[in-house]
């Protein structure tokens, strides 16, 4: 499920972050950067040869002493092995083959994940010969690049996307809805999942997830089959070492990538945090269905207006996703727990909803009659027709006289009309505008 993940792995100072930043600098059609992580940009959405994928920078903190190098590289390589579809193994062509390179290569050889060996810092043609010693790693033919000068990146990416063709899913889980539970530690993610499993009593099996800190539980209900993904909680950087936090973030983001529906769990006694906003912002940006659950509602002193007030404050903090659904529960007492999977299924149904073209155009025609498009410059937007081209999320293409004439306020108006008529609560929708010459 989700886009392929490509992890950049290597010992310190081989140029992992330089390569990542070069790729994230829109030199290869980067779709978008992730929100939130300020100093260390961990994820970037990319596209090459019509393949969309997610790049991960697994670069860590520079070790303080030699004895830390091997353990740090082992941790990086292990994480990459667990969650990546393809691994870029980056080595330093100037410094040459190092013992730490051999340590990483040994781990990668044992895995069945495809690895592209990339020799960096080959800035001149005469340096090409420096790549030959890396054949000793037993990883295959190396690709030579200079990340600082953006040389050889196309050849490297060609090799990467070749592996996507061999990594197609067998489709056996296509009918199962993947739900990722995300949020801070101790917010009640595991308690809620255990409650759901205990009440449904239809667990197929428990298997290790794609990351060390997540467990996938399969649940079959009378309204759908679900995979429940329990993720590691995200802590404040002041409470843990930064390098450990980095891996926690990577694992959580990987779980979001796999999910159809992301459930952000918030502690009712603490409210929403900046970290919550960042992580759900990533789910929003890569177009996942979203449900916000406020847990521990039993611990809040309340009257008949408390829930509305709490929800209003949440919507202000999450104003970038006004479509999100909200649910107030207590995993401990079981209050409204029965509604969790039902509400997640509603989000998923809207996430995969298709609207017939005829009905769609009737609604848009009516919307235009009620509110004519504004004049932009000297031209007024003309909408000839609209059609839905995809789901996850629902995506609509408007064929118009000139896409430059669409004003953001009118685009928002059209989106609101679609939402009012077709109920897309719980999911974002995408509107695209293409030129069609008037006959």
From Swiss-Prot:
Annotated ranges, domain EngA-type G: 4-168, 177-352
Keyword Repeat belongs to the record: yes
Entry keyword set: GTP-binding, Nucleotide-binding, Repeat, Ribosome biogenesis
PROSITE patterns noted in UniProt: G_ENGA
Domain KH-like span(s) in chain numbering: 353-437
Binding-site residues for GTP 2, renumbered to this chain: 183-190, 230-234, 295-298
One BP annotation, GO: ribosome biogenesis
GO molecular function terms noted in the UniProt entry: ATP hydrolysis activity; GTP binding; ribosome binding
InterPro entries: AAA+_ATPase, G_ENGA, GTP-bd, GTPase_Der, KH_dom-like, KH_dom-like_a/b, P-loop_NTPase, Small_GTP-bd
Family matches, as Gene3D superfamilies: 3.30.300.20, P-loop containing nucleotide triphosphate hydrolases
Binding site for GTP 1: 10-17, 57-61, 120-123
NCBIfam families: GTPase_EngA, small_GTP
Family (UniProt): Belongs to the TRAFAC class TrmE-Era-EngA-EngB-Septin-like GTPase superfamily. EngA (Der) GTPase family.
Protein role: GTPase that plays an essential role in the late steps of ribosome biogenesis.
Subunit relationships: Associates with the 50S ribosomal subunit.
UniProt name for this protein: GTPase Der
